[in-house]
């Protein structure tokens, strides 16, 4: 499915903003350094200084390209990804859905748009290093702007210690969240919690970086059925894919 239209005043943030800014910084320093070297040596060493400038300009171009792709992934790519992930849940419209690591509400709001009588809960610790402008208030403002504030709520919560009862949700979804936990043990705890609160027969869909193969193993060990891995994608310039499973 193509990316669903969003309200003009909705902002789902830039993922890992310091990293994107760092790549822009590398581009600037590389180009600036090359120009300075060329300017200081252009008369005495015209050929070598020009070659150094060309090499550093190429480095700057690559760094700027990486930064651009990270921004593009955050502004457009993740909207397309959202619809692909939600399609895998095959929502009827009456489900209770949990979004783990909801950020500014991208997946939670997308799921709420597909519901009629169902409800979505998004949880996060809202770390600003993970997403620009990351806060519960920003998520609520986005939900209001998208017209789904009555179908979605946002709670402060730890993915490793979910406060919800067993078999409470019909579907669980998460994107770019679990890799921010400290280590494999912590990620395993979060995966087990996600399955615990999922109803039998419910579906879980997780998108993340290269840890996904391990996620699939943990889900199978916990008894999940129909565990499938998608093809790799390179949004945000890093190999990522989704895992879908049924409890």
Annotated model-derived regions:
Residues 92, 160-172:
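A short acidic, Gly/Pro-enriched loop at the edge of an enzyme's catalytic core
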Residues 93-103, 121:
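Conserved class I S-adenosyl-L-methionine
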Residues 104-116:
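Conserved SAM-binding loop of SAM-dependent methyltransferases across substrates and taxa
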Residues 115, 181-182, 198-200:
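Helix-to-beta-strand junctions that scaffold the AdoMet/dcAdoMet cofactor pocket
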Residues 148-159:
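Conserved SAM-binding strand-loop segment of SAM-dependent methyltransferases
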Residues 187-200:
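A short glycine-rich, Lys/Arg-flanked "PGG" loop and its adjoining helix->strand segment in the class I
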Residues 201-208:
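Conserved beta-strand signature within the Rossmann-like core of class I S-adenosyl-L-methionine
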Residues 222-223, 227-247:
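Core SAM-dependent methyltransferase catalytic element
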């Amino acid at each position: 499915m193509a990316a669903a239209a969003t309200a003009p005043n909705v902002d789902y943030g830039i993922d890992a903003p310091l990293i994107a800014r760092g790549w822009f910084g590398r581009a600037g320093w590389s180009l600036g350094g090359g120009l300075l070297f060329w300017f200081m040596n252009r008369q005495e060493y015209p050929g070598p200084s020009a070659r150094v400038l060309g090499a550093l300009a190429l480095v700057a171009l690559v760094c700027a390209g990486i930064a651009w792709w990270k921004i593009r992934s955050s502004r457009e790519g993740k909207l397309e990804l959202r619809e692909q992930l939600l399609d895998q849940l095959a929502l009827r419209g009456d489900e209770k859905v949990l979004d783990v690591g909801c950020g500014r509400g991208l997946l939670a709001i997308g799921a709420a748009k597909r519901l009629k009588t169902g409800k979505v809960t998004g949880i996060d610790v809202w770390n600003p290093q993970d997403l620009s402008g990351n806060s519960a208030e920003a998520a609520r403002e986005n939900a209001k702007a998208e017209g789904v504030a009555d179908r979605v709520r946002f709670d402060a919560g730890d993915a490793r210690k979910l406060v919800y009862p067993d078999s409470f949700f019909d579907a669980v979804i998460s994107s770019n969240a679990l890799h921010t936990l400290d280590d494999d043990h912590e990620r395993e705890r979060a995966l087990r919690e996600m399955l615990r609160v999922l109803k039998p027969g419910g579906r879980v869909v997780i998108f993340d970086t290269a840890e996904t193969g391990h996620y699939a193993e943990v889900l199978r060990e916990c008894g999940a059925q129909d565990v499938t891995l998608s093809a790799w994608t390179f949004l945000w310039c890093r190999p990522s894919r989704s895992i879908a499973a049924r409890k």
